[in-house]
């Protein structure tokens, strides 16, 4: 026994570091994924805050027309953003040392690439850390699987879409108005609202919100009261208690009578799997949709209008969408293009008579 203790005490500094990193007794679990996650997320967060406050305007379109995004250059919380890296840089890796000066790096939107690449690495490591902690505690791995949905969505808009379009300047700006601008331009160029994978994502997000509200309200309404009427029902719960805290039979009976019997789960495990799977699968599909539209496999288009026997156009909702898309397309990057791509791709009429 004494020999064992002596060996433990003489363990190397590296061994003690490994034990500390992988210990589940720490207040916050670090883990090997955390060793990479902590510096990358700290870097992304620090640069984001500094750039959001003080970054100079960025030549996003590569046409020597810088766009301001920071608070000190005239923006507020709503209009401010980290402007994406310039189209002049394209998909090139653009760290600070690749620029002739820090001023040039800022002018070409270097902070955007720095933030996005560190952020994506950081959230991927956060997902790995979730799996790692689950593994150490003997839990099942589905927490990390669920988190893969928002990781996939972030990767789609910040990395896959710029790769497909050929430039980080097409990535989503890091700000409120910038996000909306990205959505509007995406609709104009890819007709995302008519893409079935986006529709599945909408069903996932809105359906998940509905199911979450239904589940929470049902459980809260069917608590087993352990207190008097003069006390909060919450006071009757003890953390770690063996007894059920709510009556699933009562909740099942209520919901089964509200709609019909088979609309209500009578198995708690099936119910919670459904609550997790519905929004996760929906967001997976949306990320997949963004990733395919990145390479211009777009949503349904109805460019051929419905016509009557005389050749007259019968206007439909599709015609209104097409007109709206063209309007949005001509408004964005208005100094970089003379015509939207849809109009410019049509063969020019003959001028020789």
From Swiss-Prot:
Keywords: Acetylation, Calcium, Chlorophyll, Chloroplast, Chromophore, Electron transport, Herbicide resistance, Iron, Magnesium, Manganese, Membrane, Metal-binding, Oxidoreductase, Phosphoprotein, Photosynthesis, Photosystem II, Plastid, Thylakoid, Transmembrane, Transmembrane helix, Transport
Residues with the N-acetylthreonine modification: 2
Protein residues bound to Fe cation: 215, 272
Site feature: Tyrosine radical intermediate: 161
Residues that hold [CaMn4O5] cluster according to the record: 170, 189, 332-333, 342, 344
Residues annotated as binding chlorophyll a ChlzD1: 118
Propeptide regions on this chain: 345-353
Modification Phosphothreonine occurs at: 2
Residues engaged in binding pheophytin a: 126
Cofactor, how bound (note): The D1/D2 heterodimer binds P680, chlorophylls that are the primary electron donor of PSII, and subsequent electron acceptors. It shares a non-heme iron and each subunit binds pheophytin, quinone, additional chlorophylls, carotenoids and lipids. D1 provides most of the ligands for the Mn4-Ca-O5 cluster of the oxygen-evolving complex (OEC). There is also a Cl(-1) ion associated with D1 and D2, which is required for oxygen evolution. The PSII complex binds additional chlorophylls, carotenoids and specific lipids.
UniProt site (Stabilizes free radical intermediate): 190
Any Pfam family hit: Photo_RC
Residue(s) at site: Cleavage: 344-345
Topological relation to the membrane, as annotated: Multi-pass membrane protein
Entry EC number(s): 1.10.3.9
PANTHER family assigned: PHOTOSYSTEM II D2 PROTEIN, PHOTOSYSTEM II PROTEIN D1
HAMAP family recorded: PSII_PsbA_D1
Miscellaneous field: 2 of the reaction center chlorophylls (ChlD1 and ChlD2) are entirely coordinated by water. Herbicides such as atrazine, BNT, diuron or ioxynil bind in the Q(B) binding site and block subsequent electron transfer.
NCBIfam families documented for this protein: psbA (TIGR01151)
Function as written in the Swiss-Prot or TrEMBL entry: Photosystem II (PSII) is a light-driven water:plastoquinone oxidoreductase that uses light energy to abstract electrons from H(2)O, generating O(2) and a proton gradient subsequently used for ATP formation. It consists of a core antenna complex that captures photons, and an electron transfer chain that converts photonic excitation into a charge separation. The D1/D2 (PsbA/PsbD) reaction center heterodimer binds P680, the primary electron donor of PSII as well as several subsequent electron acceptors.
Annotated protein name in UniProt: Photosystem II protein D1
Organism of derivation: Anthoceros angustus (Hornwort)
